[in-house]
């Protein structure tokens, strides 16, 4: 990417579609120019269930983004949930004919192409190769090897594989909208540069994006993308629990969640009374204590973190995580979510501050 390039990304979530327009700055980082969104229910538990609804939502967000950024959008990068992604680690050793000629850009490009030479599981296809580091013959790790003197170098890269069927569905959707797909990017990888600060980018972190209906897991060991998955639980499950247990409308449940959102009962300062306005159970008391509401929220949040912990433990990717970064509209408005995460995961957790967001 060159300085000044305009990059467009589109994320299809459980409750909405987002389009983000960014520009590459002088440091090679993408600064957000604008972000637009539109409600959409065409995705359920990570599966596309309504191509037409998704197409209309994408078209709406693109139109809004074009007006806001004053830029015509013809193509975009598209995110893919972690459940459809397989990451294969591969290393390629490139021998050079002349040690004193210096490593050329072509040498690096050839090594990247060699990294694609892997056994591809049935039903998967390669969508990207992400170089994580290059090691010279003296053991030195460099990010930009071009011009370095070395008799050989080792390229370490992640080969990103995605389900062919999901790509077919995405292609069909974007064909309807008239937008070319520049590339397909795992959601966690796309969020990494926006959600992690400079220090976190070099640390071993797990990025958790708890959305409305799904939680995206992304694990990074420095520059190396090691694991991703999707857990089919999110903020909407908390709202549904409140609605069912208290027998109130989902609209009121969502309002109460936002107003009294707290992840742990132990942090209650004042156990206020709450009047239920839409309670459908005549035998039920229409007034509850806030602790009753927070107990419902706490139980579901504990379950979400417990399932995440089981997933990363079962897949042997937990031991190297130093920090968990928490983000996502499904949980960021619930106070002490980071504390609940630390208790259940037994790893330091903090909320994402995000970066390079210009508003």
Protein language model features and the residues they cover:
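A short, acidic, amphipathic alpha-helical segment used as a generic capping/interface helix at domain edges
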Residues: 304-314
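Glycine-rich phosphate-binding/hydrolytic loop that grips phosphoryl groups
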Residues: 350-359
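A short acidic Gly-Thr/Ser loop motif
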Residues: 10-16, 80-82, 207-214, 220-223, ...
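Nucleotide/phosphate-binding catalytic cleft detector across ATP-hydrolyzing
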Residues: 1-16, 20-206, 224-226, 249-251, ...
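Amphipathic, non-transmembrane alpha-helical scaffold segments
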Residues: 294-301, 305
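Extended, folded domain segments that form the structural surfaces/walls around functional sites
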Residues: 11, 197, 209, 303, ...
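A conserved active-site cap/scaffold subdomain adjacent to cofactor or substrate pockets
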Residues: 232-253
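Glycine-rich phosphate-binding loops at beta-strand->alpha-helix junctions
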Residues: 262-264, 319-343
